[in-house]
Regions:
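Bacterial N-terminal signal peptides
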Residues: 11-20
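Bacterial Sec-dependent N-terminal signal peptides
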Residues: 19-50, 406-409
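Catalytic nucleophile-elbow at a beta strand-turn-alpha helix junction centered on a G-D-S/GDSL motif
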Residues: 53-69
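Conserved SGNH/GDSL esterase-like catalytic core that processes O-acyl groups on lipids
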Residues: 68-229
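Histidine-centered active-site loop/cap adjacent to the catalytic His
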Residues: 80-84, 370-409
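A short helix->loop->beta-strand "cap" motif at the edges of active sites that frequently abuts
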Residues: 236-240
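Mobile gating loops/cap/lid regions near enzyme active sites that modulate substrate access
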Residues: 255-327, 331-383
Length: 409
């Protein structure tokens, strides 16, 4: 028996004919009933639970849940993939690291954490790691969250506990909290047989530029080839995915400020033993505040000139440097978004957090408050706080909802 479907304004199926139809066997066949509007969100949530039934994350410190240059269970639970899974109501295993963590997250104020000097631009966690606590009891590896602090795309594809041990015992310890021997993020992801994968693997290719070493960024073509190999592995699983892009403008980064803003704080800086040259007022340069300010504090009495030494780790960026960084991020974002569209995957960018308006710059707040870079950024000036991670989780949910027609709260 055939049903003929019309498209009434309410958008549900309508049958031509009577409210019930008698089949050739004499049975009464009831027509399909429209879905009540109040039931549709529940059905969409059920669909999202199917989509994300086995949700696996590839990524960097932003996905792992690093806060204040350390990773521990509280930050891991707050990471945007974990928040996304919780909103969708799906299981999501996290390789939770016991207190005090790997490295123990720094405690405020920023002024007391001169240990950060020289660590910026690389993996903050392993750079200052003093201890790496074991996992909480009962956790089986690999878990759903495979993201590792400091990972570049090439690390996700190639790096194992064993390969990292040849470079850094600290990094090997961190990898051992996430992966089994011989595994990479990508091989562990494939082994998990995911239904959905998040891929956030672009930030660490650009991060060295925050110190002023713009030439230390990973070349776009090198990153692209590795990134595409990772996406091919994701595609091979048949899973859905959300790809994560970079911020749009490095100058909007919460811990990057104009030299003139820095100059305007000269009375407070002078009280700390830092004289600020008038050159800062006239300069068009930008300063990566955590590194620049902590370095000055370690040398007091001293004078800040806001001058740039090309490709030196001086935490000074010229306007030209910002343009170069933004050009690379734009190229990477365009490629990530293109690959997402080609594969029918969702896409959002870290711009949802890092391009938000910044709070007013006050050196006293930066050095001595609990939130030196605003409520959304942790003490290190780089990684999201729990509130910042919630912003990313919302951006991810909106992107997935739009692409897959589901309703993740």
């Amino acid at each position: 028996m055939k049903y003929f479907v019309t498209r009434p304004g309410l958008g549900f199926l309508a049958l031509v004919g009577a409210a019930s139809v008698v089949s050739s066997c004499g049975e009464i066949v009831q027509p399909p009933r429209p879905i009540a509007p109040e039931q549709r969100p529940l059905l969409n949530l059920a669909t999202s639970q199917s989509l994300l039934a086995r949700f696996v994350s590839l990524g960097t410190s932003n996905s792992q849940g690093v806060q204040s240059a350390g990773v521990a269970a509280a930050g891991q639970r707050a990471a945007w993939p974990a928040q996304l899974a919780q909103r969708a109501g799906v299981p999501y295993d996290i390789p939770l690291i016991q207190i005090p963590g790997c490295n123990p997250p720094l405690i405020p104020p920023l002024a007391a954490n001169l240990v950060l000097i020289g660590a910026f631009g690389d993996d903050l966690v392993s750079a200052i790691m003093t201890t790496c606590a074991p996992l909480e009891p009962g956790i089986a590896l690999p878990a759903s969250n495979l993201a590792i602090s400091g990972a570049k795309a090439r690390d996700a594809l190639h790096s194992t506990i064993e390969s990292e041990a040849l470079v850094s015992a600290r990094k090997a310890e961190l990898y051992a909290r996430v992966l089994l021997p011989g595994q990479t993020q990508v091989t562990a992801m494939v082994a998990k047989q995911p239904t959905f994968v998040s891929v956030e693997l672009a930030a660490n290719e650009v991060l060295p530029a925050s110190t002023g070493r713009v030439a230390a960024m990973t070349p776009f073509t090198e990153w692209r080839a590795t990134y595409d190999a990772i996406l091919n592995a994701v595609k091979g699983t048949g899973a859905g995915a959300v790809l994560v892009g970079l911020p749009n403008n490095a100058a909007n980064f919460p811990s990057i400020r104009r030299a003139r803003e820095f100059y305007n704080q000269w009375p407070y800086l002078l009280a700390l033993g830092i004289s600020v040259s008038s050159k800062c007022y006239l300069s068009s340069n930008y300063l990566f505040i955590p590194g620049y300010l902590l370095t000055l504090l370690s040398k007091t009495p001293t004078t800040a000139t806001c001058a740039d030494v090309p490709d030196a780790a001086d935490y000074v960026l010229t306007a030209g440097d910002i343009t170069v960084i933004n050009s690379q991020m734009a190229a990477m974002n365009a490629h990530i978004q293109t690959r997402a569209n080609e594969n029918g995957w969702a896409y959002f960018s870290l711009s949802a957090l890092y391009d938000l308006p910044k709070p007013a710059f006050r050196v006293v707040d930066v050095l001595f408050s609990n939130t030196p870079f605003g409520a959304n950024i942790s003490l290190d000036g780089v990684h999201p706080s729990a509130a910042g991670q919630a912003i990313l989780a919302t951006a991810a949910a909106q992107a997935i909802n739009a692409k897959y027609g589901v309703t993740i709260p």
